């Protein structure tokens, strides 16, 4: 039974495991003041060979946060506003120091330090997978975050397109049916012919 129970998390797990051959740990608890937060996914390949983002960026170890608020914020405008606030709080640092709060939890000091302890190194990337992100904010901020802090952003459209392109090359598609998401993908894309929207 999956730990996460929303569509974007299910798709992200499928993308990490089936598409990239990653081993994942999910819902890793993180102690924060007065409560617990979590890291949605930690991911790496067992042999530590890099896997790639859709733009070709190599990733060896990653912590991943998924956020889907498409009913409330279909264009990602609010996510863009929140990201700008978090980037201002980050300033030149690698994380937002406690006790400051962050809209995107992987930017918090507690999450960064726990991932460093788990991986045994600070040599890891942070990946945010969201339903959408304001294109202006993304163009302005995300290249700098990627270059200076190894923080990357993808949308569900990019994940679906990447999965679709990969699926075309899979020789044993029925082998994907061992997971619910793989079975759904094989049924909807393979049998029913669903395609990503342009």
Per-region residue spans from a language model:
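Intrinsically disordered, low-complexity Ser/Thr/Pro/Gly-rich regulatory segments
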Residues: 1-198
